[in-house]
Every structure is written in C-alpha cells, then in structure tokens.
Regions:
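N-terminal amphipathic, basic helical "cap/leader" segment at the start of enzyme domains
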Residues: 34, 48-59
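Short, well-structured alpha-helical segments
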Residues: 33-44
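Aromatic/hydrophobic pocket-lining residues that form π-stacking "cages" and hydrophobic walls in ligand
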Residues: 22, 107, 133
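Active-site cofactor/substrate anionic-group-binding motifs, chiefly glycine-
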Residues: 55-108
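Glycine-rich anion/phosphate-binding loop at the beta-strand->alpha-helix junction
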Residues: 40, 118-177
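Conserved catalytic cysteine-centered active-site region
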Residues: 106-119
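Short glycine-rich or small-residue beta-strand-to-loop segments that form or flank ligand, phosphate
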Residues: 88-92, 117-122
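Generic N-terminal amphipathic, Lys/Arg-enriched alpha-helix
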Residues: 2-29
Length: 177
C-alpha cells in the first residue's frame, strides 16, 4: 500500500489499484498494454522505494510527451546483436521504461551466456530510476553498471548557454547470496 501526503490530505491507495489506473492512463495515451504495464511498474517502484521524483509525479510529463509526439507510443524497437556479449537497441523514440526493460533483459541474457552483457540504447526517452533496472540484474547475481546521459542543464554565470550535463549512474553489486 502506498501512503503519501499531498498537502493536508492523506492518500492511501492499494498498489494493484494504482497500477490498474496508471496502466489505464498510459493506454489512453496510446501505449500497448505491455508497454503500459512496464511503465506503470517502474513508476510505482520509484514510489515504493521513496524516489518520488522518478515516480508518479512524472506521469503527466510522460503523457504530455506522448501527446506532443516526443514519445512514440507505438515504437518499432530494433535490437541488433553486435557480438555474443554486446547488443545495440534503437528504441524508435519509445517511452524510456520499455527501452530500459528490453536493455536490462538483454544484458542479463548476454551476461549469463558469456560472463558480460553490454547494451547501448539510442533514441529513447527518460526511463525513471536507474536502480530499478540494476536491481533486476543483481537479483540474478550480476554486478551492474548503468549510465545515461541528459541534455545540458547547468550553466556558469559567464556562459550564455547551458553546457553541463546531469548524468545518472547506478552501480549495484550482489553479495552473492
């Protein structure tokens, strides 16, 4: 159950009811059922671990980006095998959760076969909490490093344009149990 305060009003929602509602909203904006479920799971996980800035507070942003055609709700995602260990994904402007889900599953599969799994993703959007994906690999007893980039967001007082990127990094290590 998610318990969170919003102003003076306390909101209690059962996670399954919340998931159904988030899936419904994503489907209303054109995502397939599978993509809506993947996206809802990632957003709700962020809420459950207390990373509210990567959770439901971003739902409207994703829906707006779909409406403005920044996110492609019906992407044709291509996975290219580079080697036994390395894959490349062209996410076709998909919602980032779906691209990240495919990427971590491919990385886990490659790592289980060869000892290492590297996956690069292009043409994808914001994918939420990096640790959500890293944790999936750690549960399979794999060391995980996830990196992403972002558009320039910070500028120095003397600069005219933003030049510093804010980059997310997640490194997770299993204890072997």
């Amino acid at each position: 159950m998610i318990k969170q305060f919003h102003g003076a009003e306390k909101v209690n929602l059962k996670t399954q009811n919340l998931k159904k509602e988030v899936v419904r909203i994503f489907k209303k904006h054109g995502l397939s059922t599978d993509h809506a479920i993947i996206s809802a799971n990632a957003l709700i996980n962020a809420e459950l671990v207390g990373a509210y800035g990567h959770g439901l507070s971003r739902l409207k942003m994703y829906c707006d980006r779909i409406s403005k055609k920044v996110i492609n709700p019906k992407p044709k995602i291509k996975v290219k095998k580079i080697s036994q260990s390395i894959s490349h994904i062209d996410a076709n402007d998909s919602i980032g959760f779906v691209a990240a889900d495919i990427a971590i599953k491919k990385a886990i599969s490659n790592a289980k076969k060869t000892g290492i799994g590297l996956v690069a993703v292009k043409n994808s959007g914001h994918y939420g909490l990096s640790g959500y994906y890293a944790e999936q690999a750690v549960k399979k007893n794999l060391v995980t490093m996830i990196y992403t980039n972002a558009p320039p967001a910070i500028k120095d007082k003397l600069q005219k344009h933003r030049t510093v990127q804010l980059m997310s990094t997640s490194i997770d290590i299993t204890d072997g149990s």
